[in-house]
């Protein structure tokens, strides 16, 4: 396996929290029902957990875009919803892809790490391909 893309993203949690449920924002249709359910089940702010997932989605897009250096961008409409951040029973995150991005990255392995500290959420994504 070779690393073909790396992405990172930072999110201001207070700014994100103001917009996440506002009708007409990009965030309204971004998160899957599973992501919203997982965030609502957390003991702290749902917005805090969704902000980290937004950062992960953005990091995956940046890693994918970087893997396509010197190639035409291929960002399908609604791409954020096609990138779902799921966690196992111990809270370890993994990315599940659907739609066009799943087809583009069908042979790839995506590693993702999420964090939040204070008012900031962050994520890093690494894409490996054979």
Curated annotation (Swiss-Prot):
InterPro entries: 4-PPantetheinyl_Trfase_dom, 4-PPantetheinyl_Trfase_dom_sf, ACPS, Ppantetheine-prot_Trfase_dom. Mg(2+) binds at residues 9, 58. It catalyses: apo-[ACP] + CoA = holo-[ACP] + adenosine 3',5'-bisphosphate + H(+). Disulfide bonds: none annotated. Keywords: Cytoplasm, Fatty acid biosynthesis, Fatty acid metabolism, Lipid biosynthesis, Lipid metabolism, Magnesium, Metal-binding, Transferase. Its cofactor is Mg(2+). It is found in: Cytoplasm. It holds the Pfam family ACPS. GO terms for cellular component: cytoplasm. Signal peptide: none annotated. The keyword Cell wall biogenesis/degradation does not apply. GO terms for molecular function: holo-[acyl-carrier-protein] synthase activity; magnesium ion binding. Transmembrane segments: none annotated. It is an enzyme of class 2 (transferase). Transfers the 4'-phosphopantetheine moiety from coenzyme A to a Ser of acyl-carrier-protein. NCBIfam families: acpS, pantethn_trn, PRK00070.3-1. This is Holo-[acyl-carrier-protein] synthase. It comes from Mycobacterium sp. (strain KMS). The gene is acpS.
């Amino acid at each position: 396996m070779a690393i073909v893309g790396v992405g990172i993203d930072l999110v201001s949690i207070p700014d994100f929290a103001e917009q996440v449920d506002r009708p007409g924002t990009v965030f309204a249709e971004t998160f899957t029902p599973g992501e919203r359910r997982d965030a609502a089940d957390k003991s702290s702010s749902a917005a805090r957990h969704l902000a980290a997932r937004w950062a992960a989605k953005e990091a995956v897009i940046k890693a994918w875009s970087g893997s396509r250096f010197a190639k035409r961008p291929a960002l399908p409409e609604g791409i954020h919803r096609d990138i779902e951040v799921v966690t196992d029973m111990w809270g370890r995150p993994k990315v599940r892809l659907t739609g066009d991005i799943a087809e583009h990255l069908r042979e790839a392995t995506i590693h993702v790490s999420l964090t939040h500290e204070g008012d900031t959420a962050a994520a890093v994504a690494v894409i490996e391909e054979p």
